Amino acid sequence: ERYISLLTDFGFKRIFGTKPNKDLLINFLNSLFDGFHVIKDVKYLNSEHVGDVFAERKAIFDVYCENERGEKFIVEMQNAYQKYFKDRSLFYSTFPIREQAPKGAEWNFKLEHVYTVALLNFDLEEEAFDKNDINHDVGLLDKKTFKVFNDKLSFKYVEIAKFNKTEEELDTLYDKWLYVLKNLSRLDERPAALKEKVFTKLFEEAEIAKFTPTELKEYEDSLKAYRDVKNSIDTALEKGREEG
């Protein structure tokens, strides 16, 4: 393989979770929000959070940052289905909310927006979602009017496993990013369709031959962990088909 897999923990964090590559994260997020929300700059924040309640539950985000307006973004890559995945994403969103409360000072409870972006390498099979779409926006709405009750908490679930466009079918920047997310490690060279400057940097950063020995070892360990998870899922699915 010439390029890293962005589905691995190492690959995802290298491209989207490091300060030198914040322009890649900004471009990617802007493609997801498609003009609805424009991000000009981001500042990376501590991705490890410890709860302040009895259990002291810990949350470690893949990428945690804030934009120039102080709005918070949690960006997660999820390769395997979890029974309580929706509850987990809701739980994670509480950390950026609670940390906005100043300690030992009066506060009027005004919150900055918190966005959770979950990239799912599986079909969530969520009844509330349009089955023909893969990019889903979830928020706090009035059930009767469907009007926004509060816009400070937003969830974006992107089912990248259901993205099947070929190189010839890539029209938008959003299409191109999803194609790269899903297929980068399978490519031998940069496709002609990915002509934008941002992808020039992406392919340079993703080239395995440029890694230090330490980086290579970290990537190989991360790749093994990803493949172990993938094999476990494939085995379970195959067993289910045989029994079903």
Q: Regions from the language model: what does each represent?
A:
Residues 1-243:
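Elongated, amphipathic alpha-helical interaction scaffolds
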